[in-house]
Design a protein with these regions (language model features):
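Long, hydrophobic N-terminal alpha-helical segment
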Residues: 1-57
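Phosphate/adenylate-binding "loop-and-lid" substructures adjacent to NTP/NAD/dNTP-binding pockets
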Residues: 80
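Metal- and O2-centered redox machinery and metal/ROS homeostasis
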Residues: 2, 83-86
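Glycine-rich, aromatic-bearing surface loops/beta-hairpins
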Residues: 86, 90-146
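Heptad-repeat coiled-coil alpha-helices
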Residues: 50, 54-57, 61-64, 90, ...
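Amphipathic alpha-helical coiled-coil segments and their boundaries
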Residues: 20-23, 30, 37, 63, ...
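Intrinsically disordered, low-complexity segments enriched in polar/charged residues with Gly/Pro
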Residues: 7-9, 74, 102-104
Length: 146
């Protein structure tokens, strides 16, 4: 199972079968919980990046015992990250970028499936994008859903 993915090339409505399609209202109602989970994901992801760099530095210095301790902590954090991603998946949304807290919610717009797109720090969902659009293709929700 892919927990986080920024890759959307080739994603089509025929190939993508979400377990739930959200309305804007439904997705916004999940934000208090999703925001807490994403906060943890961003924190754990950041700590993992730091530990990875530290483990490489320690290995280069020949401090293998300490490097193994750091690797062990890294693996614990990876397990936490998996659990957090599974919590999001259970809600029906997916984290697209654990470093900044980018989340997509599958939704139906007119006759097609799209993603409602939320980024950590935003008070509500204000953007959407096509399945293959990604963050760079975000458009304002206001007036688009109907």
């Amino acid at each position: 199972m892919t927990l986080f993915t920024q890759e959307q090339d080739g994603l089509t409505e025929e190939s993508y079968k979400p377990k739930k399609l959200f309305t804007l209202e439904e997705a916004n109602k999940t934000l208090p919980l999703v925001s807490r989970i994403i906060g943890d994901i961003v924190r754990v992801s950041s700590e993992m990046q730091s530990l990875h760099a530290e483990a490489e530095r320690l290995a280069e210095e020949g401090r293998s015992v300490r490097a193994e301790e750091v690797r062990g902590r890294f693996e614990d954090l990876a397990d936490q990250l998996t659990e957090l991603a599974e919590e999001l998946n259970a809600i029906g949304c997916v984290c697209k970028d654990p470093r900044v807290g980018l989340v997509d919610y599958p939704a139906r717009m007119h006759d097609r499936v799209v993603f409602l797109c939320w980024k950590r720090g935003e008070k509500e969902i204000q953007f959407w994008h096509e399945l293959q659009g990604g963050f760079a293709g975000r458009k304002k929700v206001k007036g688009a859903l109907g």
